[in-house]
Each structure stands twice: as C-alpha cells, then as structure tokens.
C-alpha cells in the first residue's frame, strides 16, 4: 500500500471512530429527530417550502467516507458536485455524525451567514468546541459577541495598526530573507507561517521576541494539533495535551495582562494609547470582558496566523509561479512602486501596498481558487425557510464556499487562475465570500490582504525564483504537501 493510500485508509478509520464516538454520546439524530425529519419530508411533498432532497447514507457513518475520500482528492468539491446534479444546489446529507443541510447556492449561503443568533448559531466539531471554550469569540452570541467583535474589528482596521503591521512585516521579512540561501530550497510555507505568527503575536499581545515568544509558539503548536483530534480527553491523548497547552498559554497571557495593568496604574486611562488588541479590550468598561475571557480569545485569534494568512501567501506564490504572465505584471507593478519610493525618499505606507491594483487582483483570485476557508458551519435554532427550502431546527448547515467559488455558473473557466477576471467584476457579491460573512465576517480580512501584499512585494523586488512541483492538500486544512520549496536567486 503506497503512502497516499495508507493516509486515506487512516483518515477513513480516524473519522469513522469520531462518528461512532459521536453516536455513543448522543450526537446522532435521536428517534424523535428522525420522526421530525420524516414529518418535514411529508410536509414538503404536499405544500409550502420543501425539505432538501438527498441521502443520509449508511447507518452511523452516513456519507462520511465518500466525503473524506473526495476531500483528499484534487477536486474536493466532487462530493458536492455529484449531489448537486442529483438533488440540486441545496441537499441533505449526514457527515461526521451529524445530519446536515449542505448548500452550494450563493444566495442561500449569504442568507444563512447574515442571519442572527435567533436563527443560526456557530457549529463546530466537539473537539474544537472543547478547545475553544464557551467564551470563545467563535462560539459566543448576542451582545457580548457584537461588543467583542466590534472592538477587535475596529482596532484591526485602524491605520495605526496597519502602519505597525507594515513595519513589523518589513523587519521580520528582512531578517528572514537575509538568511535565505541560493544553494538550498526555501520552504515558503514555513517562512510565511513564522513571519505571520510573529506579526500576529505582537498585534494581539505585544510579544515580539525572546523566550516569551518561543514558549508561546511551542505551546501553540501543541494546542493547534488537537483541533482535528479524537474527542477523547484523558492523559496521553492529543486532546488532553492540547487542552493543557492552552491552559499554559492562557496563564502566560494573563501574566502579560497583569503586567500591562501595573504599568498603567499611575496614568490616566485616556492617555494610554492602545498598542495591541489586549490594550483595546482592557480599556473597555464591560464587566463581561474578564481577564480570563480576553486571554482565552487571544489564543483563539492566533489560529489565522498559523493557517489562513500563511496559506494565502503560499498559494499566491504557487499560482504566480505557474502563471508567468501574471507574475511578470505583478513584478513590474511592484518594481515601479519601489523605484518611485526610492526616488522620493519616502517609506512604503500600508495604503501604498493596498493601492497596487494588479497585486490586489492576484490576491482576490488566490482567495477564490485557493479557498483557504472551504466552508462555514451553522446550527439551526428553529425551522428556517430560505429560497423555498426549509432548514429544520437542530440540523447542521454547511455553506460550502469552495463549490460556489469554482462554479461555472458564477465564473468562466473557474479552474483557471485568471486575476484579470476581477478588472470589471464586483467582489461584493454573494458568489464571493472567502472570509465568511454577516456579523461573523472575519475581522482580520484587511490585515490578511495587507500581509500578503507586503510579502509579495518583498519577494518579487528582491528575488527571482523557481518553484518545485508541489501539491495542494485540501483536507483537513488547506496546505502544500511539501511546503512549497522554491529555489531563489537574488536580484
């Protein structure tokens, strides 16, 4: 059995265990819910909104095996495409132990993602819920979520932070790129991950270097390893190790918070300029924003620095490496900006990077094709009717964004990397939602674009490179199989 077959077999075995475990713990539909399912089916046959067609698959495991098999292929959306042809763009299924309504319809997805918590709430696998905790920004609802999301979002969009991000990216990238060798490949995914984590750690809690950063990174690696682990918590299991790692990180962040409070005791609160997200949250008077809640959420917010941003950067370089015309135009655009700034003696500001039109089109097209976030899950809190479909109370809803982004209904030649398609196209449509949507739209989306813009600028203005052949792995998270090795030559 070759390596890929072994991996696939292990994945099947792994997820079947998860499904069986969920079944034992009552996550599988109860007899009462089965009756309700049948009631919905009968109702939809006679009048009113229809219950989506589809199949619940095999007993216990549902359609999980076929879903995982497709997820590991080079066309993960094939599972969805097959059912879309059979049942339509919205259909029922049963994956990972949960009865699920799956949508590949852009309008239905937008309607669900824009709904409030009376209709839909976030839904995550049991392991993720345990690791995040009930007070995570990913799970909380109502006024506390709006308050937290608003405070964090405003700061992440602020010109002050964007200027800091540019300075930090320049510093960390220069330190890294100065050490790159022409005699051995640079693992681009690892480099981008290291830089992005440093940038985010400073933006969140002002940890920049030294033992604090190294300790945080070590514990974070242990923590994030448990996100796709078995939901079994006892000494020796990955979930137990991950929970312990998070406890250690929370204690570290709480010490940082206590230090900040001590340093500002003798100052007027209004005179304290927020340098990071913790400062912003500490300045808020809400009694609900406890130090423990803040510390826990700082850990959760580090996940994009480990996954989303580095993957976006890596995929952009991968797609550009395979598209010489796009790479040449992006390089020309960035070299012109560099020459202009050298001529005037001005530094590069954050809005300089975001004003590069073709660079932004490349990032947008990378988001569409790369699908860093392949889908978003919600749970229906009541029966909800959308576009003629009824989504039953208690059912999971999966907005499968990847299928929408690669649908020829919305995009001509959807599997072709074509940044020029965005010259006349509006990004603010239901058919483009790489960061989710609604009240839970990722607050760091502007920073993701900015960090990618800065990275690409430094790369194309300092180096020429050849990328080795590599494969995009789409499950359980998007990443490059070999970390995208590139052979560089300095300009």
UniProtKB/Swiss-Prot annotation:
First-level EC class: oxidoreductase
Catalytic reactions on record: 3-epi-6-deoxocathasterone + reduced [NADPH--hemoprotein reductase] + O2 = 6-deoxotyphasterol + oxidized [NADPH--hemoprotein reductase] + H2O + H(+); (22S,24R)-22-hydroxy-5alpha-ergostan-3-one + reduced [NADPH--hemoprotein reductase] + O2 = 3-dehydro-6-deoxoteasterone + oxidized [NADPH--hemoprotein reductase] + H2O + H(+)
GO cellular component terms listed in the entry, alphabetical order: endoplasmic reticulum membrane
Listed EC numbers: 1.14.14.147, 1.14.14.-
Cell compartment(s), UniProt: Endoplasmic reticulum membrane
Alphabetical list of PROSITE patterns matching this protein: CYTOCHROME_P450
GO molecular function: 22alpha-hydroxysteroid 23-monooxygenase activity; heme binding; iron ion binding; oxidoreductase activity, acting on paired donors, with incorporation or reduction of molecular oxygen, NAD(P)H as one donor, and incorporation of one atom of oxygen
Tissues in which the protein is found: Expressed in leaf vascular tissue.
Cofactor field: heme
Listed pathway(s): Plant hormone biosynthesis; brassinosteroid biosynthesis
Disruption-associated phenotype: No visible phenotype under normal growth conditions, but the double mutant plants cyp90c1 and cyp90d1 exhibit a characteristic brassinosteroid-deficient dwarf phenotype.
Pfam families: p450
Keyword annotations: Brassinosteroid biosynthesis, Endoplasmic reticulum, Heme, Iron, Lipid biosynthesis, Lipid metabolism, Membrane, Metal-binding, Monooxygenase, Oxidoreductase, Steroid biosynthesis, Transmembrane, Transmembrane helix
Transmembrane segments: 7-27
SUPFAM superfamilies with a match to the protein in the record: Cytochrome P450 (SSF48264)
Matching InterPro entries: Cyt_P450, Cyt_P450_CS, Cyt_P450_E_grp-I, Cyt_P450_sf
Binding site residues for heme: 442
Membrane topology qualifier: Single-pass membrane protein
Domain of life of the organism encoding this protein: Eukaryota
Coiled coil: none
Family: Belongs to the cytochrome P450 family.
Function: Involved in brassinosteroid (BR) biosynthesis. May convert teasterone (TE) to 3-dehydroteasterone (3DT, 3-DHT), or 6-deoxoteasterone (6-deoxoTE) to 3-dehydro-6-deoxoteasterone (6-deoxo3DT, 6-deoxo3DHT).
Protein name in UniProt: 3-epi-6-deoxocathasterone 23-monooxygenase CYP90D1
Organism of origin: Arabidopsis thaliana
